[in-house]
Each structure stands twice: as C-alpha cells, then as structure tokens.
Amino acid sequence: MNHGYRTIEFLGLTFNLTNILMITVASVIVLLIAILTTRTLSIRPGKAQNFMEWIVDFVRNIIGSTMDLKTGANFLALGVTLLMYIFVSNMLGLPFSITIGHELWWKSPTADPAITLTLAVMVVALTHYYGVKMKGLKEYSKDYLRPVPFMLPMKIIEEFANTLTLGLRLYGNIFAGEILLGLLAGLATSHYSQSVALGLVGTIGAILPMLAWQAFSLFIGAIQAFIFTMLTMVYMSHKISHDH
C-alpha cells in the first residue's frame, strides 16, 4: 500500500504529477458534463437537461436553507461547481487505481490532504472576500469584535478550525475508503502464489465485501460532496449576513 508519486521540480518547487493529472481529469469530466447537459436547452427538457436542472435545484435549496435566496443567487454557480467537482473527484479512485512500478498514477484527488486543504483555504478565502465586498472592510472587521471585543482570539481560532475541519473531513473519509478497497483487493489476489484454488477462494471471499464497500463509498462520496457544499454556504452566510 506504500506507493510513491511522480514529481517534477520547477522554479525550486516540487509538483506532484499524479495530483495534477487527477485534478485535470476531474475538471475535464465536470466541464464535459456541464457542456453535454446544457448544449441543447429546451422548454421540454430531455434526461440530460433534467439531470442538470435537478442539481441546480438541489444546490439552490442548500443555499436557501442558509441565506436569503436573493443574495444567495450570487453563489449558485459556486455551489454547483463545488458539488459536481468534489463528487466526481471522490468517485475517480473508487472503481480502480493505477500503479506503474511503485508510483501511483490514478486515485481520487480528494484522497490527498494537500488538495482538500487547498479547496478549503480557497473557500474560506472567498467567504472573507465576499464579506468585505458586501459589508465593507470597516463593518466586516467589527464582526470579529462582536458581541464583545475579547472574542477576537476565539474568532481567529475558529477561522483556522473551520478551514482544517472542512479540508480534513473530506480527505479522511475518501482516503479511508480507498485504503480499505486496496486491502480487499490485496486479499483477493494475495493467495494465488500458493495455489490457484486458494487464490480463487480468496477472490470469491473478497468480491462481496468489495462490492458492498464500493456501494457504501459511493454513498459516502455523495454525502461528503453535499457536506462540503453545505458548509461552504453556511460559512458564506455568516460572513455576508448583517446578523453576524
């Protein structure tokens, strides 16, 4: 289970090619889904358009549960993109992984803490940006001193805690799922070196647990995409609302 990653050095920085590949694959898949489901918009939508409209309505309901929809409409595209991108990213490593030599080339990008924490930092940074944009820097800064000024240290700690939990929750769930799938796959193939019969027994014994865990991982991947999107909108609501 200990695999390395192909890296390159550029301008003194180290880049993980596996992560770059999987981020690109996830982005292309989401882009293709968006294009294919919206290229022929009609008053009488087909299955593809219905699918995209369902996603948009689902995200609109998420936003509506956290803030006024008139304001929240500004974040509909963000919510749809986050939900689709994270779900697709969660699913990429579910059916299989690809290892060449001792280097892992195909996995879920969200099974890497660097990616999930980067997503979390970007989201939290966006909430601060829109907070300042919609309330003004002076009014936004006062929120950190409310209801009493000595809450400032606690609110700063809260910002770091929100960022860490948002990123690490997603990473932990997806990474754990891929680890267990890898262990079950190893169980299915580990006994062939001893005998074909023993190997077949191991394979048959591992098939049902693998199928069950893949189904559960599909559910977990969807739930984690929902939670990430929901919390993004909750954090956004806290930053732009005049009640906070």
UniProtKB/Swiss-Prot annotation:
Q: Where in the cell is it found?
A: Cell membrane
Q: What does this protein do?
A: Key component of the proton channel; it plays a direct role in the translocation of protons across the membrane.
Q: How does it sit in the bilayer?
A: Multi-pass membrane protein
Give the multimer and partner information. F-type ATPases have 2 components, CF(1) - the catalytic core - and CF(0) - the membrane proton channel. CF(1) has five subunits: alpha(3), beta(3), gamma(1), delta(1), epsilon(1). CF(0) has three main subunits: a(1), b(2) and c(9-12). The alpha and beta chains form an alternating ring which encloses part of the gamma chain. CF(1) is attached to CF(0) by a central stalk formed by the gamma and epsilon chains, while a peripheral stalk is formed by the delta and b chains. The F(1)F(0) complex interacts with SpoIIIJ and YqjG; YqgA is found in the same complex.
Gene name tied to this protein = atpB
Q: What is its main location?
A: membrane
Q: Which Pfam families match?
A: ATP-synt_A
What are the GO BP annotations of this UniProt entry? proton motive force-driven plasma membrane ATP synthesis
Is the keyword Transmembrane helix assigned to this protein? yes
Q: Which GO terms describe its cellular component?
A: plasma membrane; proton-transporting ATP synthase complex
Q: What InterPro entries does the annotation carry? A: ATP_syn_F0_a_bact/chloroplast, ATP_synth_F0_asu, ATP_synth_F0_asu_AS, F0_ATP_A_sf
Which keywords annotate this record?
ATP synthesis, Cell membrane, CF(0), Hydrogen ion transport, Ion transport, Membrane, Transmembrane, Transmembrane helix, Transport
Similarity comment text for this entry: Belongs to the ATPase A chain family.
Quote the CDD domains the UniProt record gives: ATP-synt_Fo_a_6
Keyword Signal belongs to the record: no
- Species of provenance: Bacillus subtilis (strain 168)
- What protein name does the entry list? ATP synthase subunit a
| A GO molecular-function descriptor | proton-transporting ATP synthase activity, rotational mechanism
What residues form the membrane-spanning segments? 17-37, 75-95, 112-132, 170-190, 221-241
Q: Which domain of life is it from?
A: Bacteria
